[in-house]
Amino acid sequence: MKLISWNVNGLRACVQKGFLDYFHAADADFFCIQESKLQEGQIALDLPGYHQYWNYAGKKGYSGTAIFAKHEPLQVTRGIGTAICDTEGRVITLEYDSFYLVTCYTPNSVSYTHLTLPT
């Protein structure tokens, strides 16, 4: 099984720079992307042999994830059941008979308080 995960930092720009050539050459079973920065309907990818699962952010030009899978899952879950995360399109989970595949784009921790341990 071949899995690729890539933070594309904007899929439209990435497509213009050769993403599809790499995608097809890689021939991965699962291709996960983070930070797609897309809204529904902004791009149509022709990926024969792949099922496409998208989780869009509510905010334009922000976050978003996708999984392109050769194998159709039993179930697809978008989000984790927490409104603050789910409106940002950060998580997709695919359920299969013997495993779960999760792609996650985590928030930047700059705005959070960090625990500093003594040295």
Residue ranges and their predicted role:
Residues 1-47, 57, 62:
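N-terminal, active-site-proximal structural segment of metallo-dependent hydrolase catalytic domains
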Residues 17-20, 94, 115:
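Conserved CoA-thioester-binding segment of acyl-CoA-metabolizing enzymes
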